[in-house]
Amino acid sequence: RIDEENCCLIANGNIIKVIYANNPDEIDYTQYDINDALIIDNTGSWRDEAGLSRHLQSKGASKVMLTAPGKGNLKNIVYGINHDQILPEDKLITAASCTTNAIAPVLKMLNDKFGIESGHVETVHAYTNDQNLIDNYHTGNRRGRSAALNMVLTETGAAKAVVKAVPELAGKLTGNAVRVPIPNVSMAILMLNLTTPSSKEEINEFLRLIALHSNLQNQISYTQDPDAVSSDFVGSREAAIVDSTATIVEGNRCILYLWYDNEFGYCNQVVRMVFKMAGINYRQYPEEG
C-alpha cells in the first residue's frame, strides 16, 4: 500500500522510503538512518565513472551499482561468470544488461567445451520505455515508431558487452535486436560456428547437465516443453532458459534459442550482485570447489 503522509511504500510489512531529489549528490541518507548505502542506479542517466561517482558525494552513500552496461573502465559483471572480480574496495560496479546476463553464461560454457569461432546474437526483445507508444520523435529513428504496433529493428550492445565478461570471445560476435509489442520476456537467438563439430543431442545434454548440476544453476535453466511460449517464462528467476526443442546443430553450425524474463530474471541477477558487494554469503548447492 501507499503511505502518502510519510512518503512510503509498504510491501509485505516492509517500509520502503521514497526520496525525491533532482541530482544524486543532493541526498543525505543519514537523515533516514541509512549508513554505508549501496545505491542501485537504474535511471540510465549516468553510465560512466564521473557520473556515477556523484552518488558517492551523498552523505551515507558507500557503493554504487549500475543496472546497464557501463562505459570506460568500469567493471561490467555478469553474476556467475566474472563476479569473482568484485573486490571489497570496489565502489562502482555495473551489472551489464538483461540480454548480456542471458547470453554470457551459455556462451561461456559452449566456448569452454566446443570452442566458438564466430557467431551472431539476435534478440527478440519486449518493448521498453525507451520507445514511443505512438509515432513520435526519437533520437533513434526506428525507436520513434509505435512500440505497441510494430516490430522495431534496432541495435543491441550485448554482443560487445559479453566480451567484458568473457574476453576470449573478443571480435567473434555481432548482434542486433528486434523489439516486439509484448510487455515482458524476450528471446536471444545464438547463431554460432563452433570449433568442434557436435550434434543437437550432445549440445542439449551438455546444457541440461549444466542447468542441473553446475554452479550456474541460477543462470542457466532448461526446458523440453514443445508447447513453450513467451508468457510461460514470466517470473523466471534464472538469467536464461534453453529451449532445447528448438536447438539446431549441423556439424560446426549451432543455433540456440534462449528465453529470458528481461525484468524479473535480470533483477535476480542484480540481487545476487548486491549480496556479493555487501558481503552477504549464503551457502550454495552444489558447493563451489
Regions found by a protein language model. Give the residues of each.
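Acidic active-site catalytic centers that drive phospho-/nucleotidyl reactions
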Residues: 41, 189, 261
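A generic structural signal for alpha-helix starts
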Residues: 101, 197-198, 264-265
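Generic alpha-helical structural context detector
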Residues: 108, 164, 208, 272-275
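C-terminal substrate-binding/catalytic lobe of Rossmann-fold NAD(P)-dependent oxidoreductases
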Residues: 1-30, 115-118, 123-254
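N-terminal Rossmann-like NAD(P) cofactor-binding subdomain of oxidoreductases
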Residues: 1-133, 137-144, 248, 272-273, ...
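NAD(P)-dependent Rossmann-like dehydrogenase/reductase catalytic/cofactor-binding core
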Residues: 234-289
